[in-house]
Amino acid sequence: MDKFWTFLTALHSGAGPIVMLLYPLYASVIAMESTTKVDDEQWLAYWIIYSFLSLTELILQSLIEWIPIWYTVKLVFVAWLVLPQFQGAAFIYNRVVREQFKKHGVLRSTHSKPTKPNILHSIFPHREGHEAHSH
């Protein structure tokens, strides 16, 4: 029974990097090489949400240490984000991230201009045609 428990523990520990990093990295490269834009949006949404989750963990690290099932909950949540059957990352991005950015005037809606100064626009001005800069 000890060997089985050791195996399960190792499997549980290894699942995190595979689900949270390796599979998303692989799928992101495949998406970038495909002609469709839908998969690009799914994986860009994933990396935005995963980055936010990682930053939140850094900030709340001392609190999270007291939650014994945190790693398992995070693993299940990230699996929901990455599995193509669920498209959780796109769902969270569209329902939460995009709406919050619109609400705070960071993103322009399709019919109106931002009500507040767009700080991201001042940092990263939009360039027509997305031309590359040569150095």
UniProtKB/Swiss-Prot annotation:
Disulfide bonds: none
Membrane spanning residue stretches: 11-31, 42-62, 63-83
GO cellular component: membrane
GO biological process: flower development; hyperosmotic salinity response; negative regulation of autophagy; pollen development; response to abscisic acid; response to cold; response to water deprivation
Membrane topology: Multi-pass membrane protein
Compartment(s): Membrane
Induction annotation: By abscisic acid (ABA), cold, drought and salt stresses.
Alphabetical keyword list: Membrane, Stress response, Transmembrane, Transmembrane helix
Pfam families: TB2_DP1_HVA22
Tissue: Predominantly expressed in flower buds.
Similarity annotation: Belongs to the DP1 family.
Protein name: HVA22-like protein d
Organism of this sequence: Arabidopsis thaliana (Mouse-ear cress)
Lineage: Eukaryota, Viridiplantae, Streptophyta, Embryophyta, Tracheophyta
